[in-house]
Regions:
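Short flexible/disordered coil segments
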Residues: 53, 74-83, 119-126
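Active-site/ligand-binding-proximal alpha/beta "capping" segment
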Residues: 59-107, 112
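Structured adenosyl-cofactor binding patch, chiefly the S-adenosyl-L-methionine
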Residues: 2-6, 20-33, 90-126
Length: 126
């Protein structure tokens, strides 16, 4: 539902992502799952290649990236976000046009995926 609120045009998920048909997941989307197009793909690397082939700039959230606000996220972009436990695979990270990160203070190493995604989606929507 945060994606819908931020104005995203769709979601691409790998087949090993959370089960979007789980009743708790459906309820948590407050109906957004029925309004925002999504695709579940067998080959995420191929999906990233297809995005890039169609002129979509890809940004991967990565601890080794540049600060997300040091440049401009373009309107036609895709945000690549890893899961809570492992982050993005090196294969997917390497395919990104740019690695980006959110600045951290204190001893915190990372934000949870939902919060990080929300920050980046709203930056892309500016």
């Amino acid at each position: 539902r945060t994606g819908e609120a931020a104005g995203i045009s769709g979601i691409i998920m790998s087949k090993d992502s959370a089960d979007i048909y789980n009743p708790k997941v459906i309820r948590s989307t407050m109906g957004s799952i029925f309004r925002v197009p999504f695709a579940i793909v067998d080959d995420l690397a191929a999906a990233v290649d297809t995005l890039k082939d169609n002129g979509i700039t890809t940004y991967a959230a990565h601890l080794k990236g540049e600060l997300y606000n040091s440049g401009s996220l373009t309107k036609d972009c895709a945000l690549l976000i890893g899961n809570e436990a492992r982050g993005l695979s090196e294969e997917i990270s390497a395919k990104a046009d740019k690695l980006i990160k959110i600045p951290m203070h204190g001893k915190v190493e990372s934000l949870n995926a939902a919060i990080a995604t929300a920050i980046l989606m709203y930056e892309a929507a500016r």
